[in-house]
């Protein structure tokens, strides 16, 4: 990881640059010891009074645990429906808007999606491929091919159901860790509050 440090006026800015080749399924947590270590180093250096999270997509959710352990209040800005919807968009397979979360509805929506691959299958296949192909372009192309193959064979509703349950518990943990949510729109605020 590359950590960039600079000041904007009197505000210290730290950026952790992390390259992402592919997501890890719908659960969206990316446990990564090096990322967490870099984050803890920054927290140790600045000892903040408050933390503002813009998004946790492709980040280790353990950073919230670190802040909670240190009693650092967390503010989270909502930008989309990521906490509620694994597809982020809340669009059903027929392109209608989802009317609200339910385990069964999410399972059916995700398992009917052409891009859904269970976390276990994706992790297993990517670990085999990543060892063979180090060039990013080849790696990404192989991921695309594997997604198509798995879609043809189907991953099944049972796999989607366990992924939905795990994701829901993970998102609930995130929500419980946050002290204050900020929403840029009344629509997003209402949708989040009703979830």
Regions found by a protein language model. Name each.
Residues 69, 96-180:
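Membrane-proximal helix-turn-helix segments that form the acceptor-binding/catalytic region
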Residues 82, 187-189:
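Alpha-helix capping/helix-boundary segments
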